[in-house]
Amino acid sequence: MRNIIKISALALSLLTAAASANAQVVLTQKNMSLELANQIASASVAACAANGYAVAATVVDRAGIVRAVQRADNAGPHTLGASQQKAFTSASAKNTTLAMMEGSQKNPAAANLVYIPGYLLLGGGVPVRVGNEVIGAVGVGGAPGGNLDEQCAMAALDKVKDQLK
């Protein structure tokens, strides 16, 4: 009986060791290339310019680190910071900043999101997805309303959608 218990314990420890050895310790993730980031930033600024808005667009990778920035002629200096914070917020939360803003207005507890360093709850931040995976975000600032900033970001993502498969 003791031998059976010892053999069972040994077998269990070997199975546990084998399972641990198969655990994934190095992750493989999709991320934002510089080429794609530049295309999205450029297309965002162009989409807003077509509607008469001088904006800045910032594209960040999945970690919220800036990959590309473009600022239209005559865009205000505040548009750079706003676009970066919107992109960071969207990448971090994996949601549009317009949806987050609207949610925080309806839910008093969510209003505390404004205290997270780097977050900006104004429309214009949109996640960049490959399938269901967020690989970054684009933030647009400078149009006369966050909903218009978001429209420019969405137009840019529509322009590169074939590359996001």
Residue ranges and their predicted role:
Residues N22-K165:
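Flexible, solvent-exposed loop/hinge segments and secondary-structure transition points
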Residues M1-A9:
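Bacterial N-terminal signal peptides that target proteins for export
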Residues S8-A18:
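Bacterial N-terminal signal peptides
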Residues N3, A21-N22:
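Generic short amphipathic/hydrophobic targeting helices enriched at N-termini
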